[in-house]
Regions:
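C-terminal catalytic lobe of FAD-dependent flavoproteins
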Residues: 281-364
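Active-site substrate-recognition segment that forms the wall
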Residues: 17-21, 44-46, 78-81, 179, ...
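Conserved FAD-binding subdomain of flavin-dependent enzymes
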Residues: 18-21, 31-85, 94-103, 228-230
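Predominantly flavin-linked oxidoreductase catalytic cores and closely associated redox partners
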Residues: 128-216
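N-terminal Rossmann-like FAD-binding beta1-loop-alpha1 element of flavoenzymes
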Residues: 2-27
Length: 364
């Protein structure tokens, strides 16, 4: 069976990995590089039970458990570890009483904010380095028969008689396929010109990574931050196993560029994050800035993933729209998609809540 996956982010790489476990060596097409967009610039935070009562709950719990299995199966260090996770309040307009809340639980924080709730412990929350994890998945897939090919997809070809995909055109060359999977993150929007897909949008966010002189503990922080204007933000601060600290929290409204290579970085937004880091911790105030980053998270109209077969064209599939939970839900998505493609149905989870045709196609 010839399978082509368009996109070498974490979702496409996970699908390639689980297909390889079934003896199917997919061809992964990527315009830029592995994990070149959000899959290389996310926080890599994982939570098992933060979607309880929502359609994503089954997917999240399956994926969290698969992450544990993958630490042994991939046999490479990508910074996976369990963490404690706290909620913290911080304001530029008012102060909090010293010693309140759970602030003493995280010993590298200043006294300006208040840690007021344990959101998860080492049984329910974890963290990894997103780019290294994505590369580990794709490397394992390629070792088992998959291949990565750099190029720009120009069209998806269909056999009108059989009403089935026949392949794709990449940089002017036709590649035949029995199945084609759209896993291009927010750039899956480009595929709406070839297939009846719903609109996929890109939400832009900024992040920085810091290298502190003093190591910090494995405690993730989700902030409720009030700025001088009274606006509320939700920064996330994720220490990594390699000693770096990741911080995100401000968004932008720039339109999605044609290529991930053209994503612009707003240094003003990143510098705001730098100042915020210093408010949270003196250790972070003295840290070296390693990177300023920006990326677009894929999201659709109802903020749910779009995963499954594309109606009307046999052999056409899509897996995108995971928003901020792509790194978490990649293993479950990859496993279910591999089952759907190879066996005709997903047996690990019910994909019905994520069916592409639950939403109207962008192009009628």
């Amino acid at each position: 069976m010839d399978v082509i996956i368009i996109g070498a982010g974490v979702i496409g790489s996970a699908i390639a990995y689980y297909l390889s476990r079934k003896g199917i060596g997919a061809t992964v097409i990527e315009r830029c590089d592995t994990a070149c967009a959000a899959s290389g610039k996310s926080g890599g935070f994982l939570a098992r039970d933060w979607c309880v009562g929502q359609p994503q709950d089954q997917l999240a719990q399956l994926s969290f458990d698969l992450h544990t299995d993958l630490t042994d199966a991939l046999a490479t260090d990508y910074g996976y570890r369990r963490v404690d996770t706290y909620a913290m309040a911080l304001s530029d307009r008012r102060s909090f009483a010293r010693g309140t809340g759970l602030s003493t639980a995280v010993n590298w924080l200043n006294n300006e904010g208040v840690v007021h709730k344990l959101l998860g412990d080492t049984t329910t929350t974890a963290q990894l380095h997103p780019e290294r994890f994505t590369r580990a998945l794709l490397t394992a897939a390629c070792t088992a028969g998959a291949q990565l090919r750099l190029g720009t997809v120009e069209s998806i070809e269909r056999d009108p008689v059989k009403n089935q995909v026949s392949g794709i055109t990449v940089d002017g060359r036709f590649l035949s396929a029995d199945a084609v999977v759209i896993a291009m993150g927010p750039w899956s929007l480009l595929a709406t010109q070839w297939l009846p897909l719903p609109a996929i949008y890109g939400l832009k966010g900024y992040s920085i990574t810091l290298s502190p002189n003093t190591p910090v503990t494995a405690d993730a922080l989700f902030l409720d931050y009030e700025d001088q204007l009274g606006e509320r933000h939700g920064p996330e601060l994720i220490p990594r196993a390699d000693g770096e600290v990741y911080l995100c929290g401000f968004s932008g409204d720039d339109p999605l560029p044609v290529s991930p290579e053209d994503v612009s970085i707003d240094d003003t937004a990143c510098n705001r994050l730098r100042v915020l880091a210093g408010r949270v911790s003196t250790v972070l105030a003295e840290a070296t800035v390693v990177q300023h980053q920006a990326c677009y998270r894929p999201i659709c109209e109802d903020a749910m993933p779009v995963v499954g077969a594309i109606q009307g064209t046999r052999g056409a599939y899509v897996a995108t729209g995971h928003n901020c939970w792509g790194m978490l839900n990649a293993p479950g998505t990859g496993l279910a998609m591999a089952e759907l493609i190879s066996d005709g149905q997903a047996s690990s989870i019910d994909l019905a809540p994520f069916a592409p045709d639950r939403l109207p196609p962008l192009r009628q």
